[in-house]
Amino acid sequence: MADTNTYQAQANELSQKLWAIANELRGQMDASEFKNYILGVIFYRYLSERTEMYMAEILENDGVTYEEAFADDDYRPAVENWSLSKLGYVIKPENLFRNLIRKITKFENDADKFSVEDFEKAINDLVGSTMGHESNKAFDGLFNDMRLQDARLGETVADRTDMIGRVMVKVSDIDFDLQDSQFDVLGTAYMILIGLFASDAGKKGGEFFTPAGPSRLCATLASLGLDEAKTVGDCTCGSASMLLEVQKHLTTHKVGHFYGQELNATTYNLSRMNMIMHGVDWQNFDIYKGDTLKDDKYGDGLKLTVQVCNPPYSLKWSADKKFEDDPRYSGAGKLAPKGQADLAFVEHMIYHMDDSDGRVAVLLPHGVLFRGGAEEAIRKYIIKDLNRLDAVIGLPANLFHGTGIPVCVLVLKSKRNGNSGNILFIDASKEFKAGKNQNVLEQEHIDKIVDAYAKRENVDKFAHVADMSEIIENGYNLNIPRYVDTFEEEEPVNLDAVKAQIKTLDSETKAAIDKAESFMRQLGL
């Protein structure tokens, strides 16, 4: 297990090497595009080394290497079946990452020299090996964003070969140990790379990536007190960072199955890569591509133990009348507004909550707490009819890429037991460390919020347990300042002291003017 110092050293080394790789591609394409090549190469190396590790383990007693077993016509089918069953894919020995690197750096003749087409074939062979197998759901189209024939890599095959070859060699120099589950290479790489493109014109990293602090907070709140989770879901999963974060906060770190849905094709691929690189077997996750609000890929029967989500804020959606018959949205009698789909995502999550002990932690803009019309009706339905809303937590501004607005966390539970007659409000807007470009929610801030949530007590200027009579009196308006008074009284002003100070200043001013006039008379002015 890596300690904190080891982790930081690994992260610093990775950061330096990623910058070096990024500089190989800089100027030839947009940063948000070259990340796809770097992550794709890192991911392929991971799959390759995982193959080698697994094959060495199962072939140890037979005393043969993977190359020898694969070359044997009698042995090969068994080896391929083992790899497909366990890993979900097959990488031929000649396509192993180390063998491709050897062709780049140690070729003995032109016939053995690496070409970008070798890497393209290796990827196609890998994905092709999953065709007709259940694992295809996890690997189909996974490398689509790494366009190895793109002219921006080079006008000729030789130019593209040189460019990709240099990136592959630099990736081969990154030191990561597959046995070291404490160091998340892909996740760390993604966080570094997102910094390169999140501020680019027209690019919003927040669409794909939830910073570590808010992600950790939601995962902790939603999994509090759970030993394990049968099912975990994120209906706008982005890079799947929040999905994976939940597992870390379960007592046993056990999740039966992960579910996610993502609209953006590039991010959909990244989320599947992230699951695999975190050691989640292909059998244990289903990430779907599609529009969650329009096309629920989960299906009617799926019920989830834990759900976390950071949906796109105030998204426009059709709010078509047909959705009035959708069981996810029909309960409130009104649809979320066309210009603000925020509560439609909440209704989707409520629909998929496990009835026995379902939990949700979702990040949303503050507008959902107090806007009227349809949103007021939906809030009332969630609170009064369903009794699912457990807590409202206000977070600091400027925590996210691409937006400086403050957001809140809504915590919902299907079984609220003794808390069914109240809602907890927490104002954590001052809980942050100021950063250069972005505020940071650190562990001490998360601990303070989670502790207040767990204790569920009134804390002056920080937390308030509001009973239902207060909620009703406020017309189901959940605006946090209505419940948590953060007003700081100013010290009383001593009027006599102020008058004396003014008198002194007047005297000093008059003396200065008299002195200036005296100088001017002496100068004849």
Predicted regions, residues:
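Short small-residue beta-strand/loop micro-motif enriched in glycine and branched aliphatics
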Residues: 198-201, 254-256, 433-434
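Conserved S-adenosyl-L-methionine
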Residues: 204-309, 314-323, 329-332, 343-344, ...
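Non-catalytic, mostly N-terminal accessory regions of nucleic-acid modification and defense proteins
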Residues: 1-217, 222, 286-292, 394-398, ...
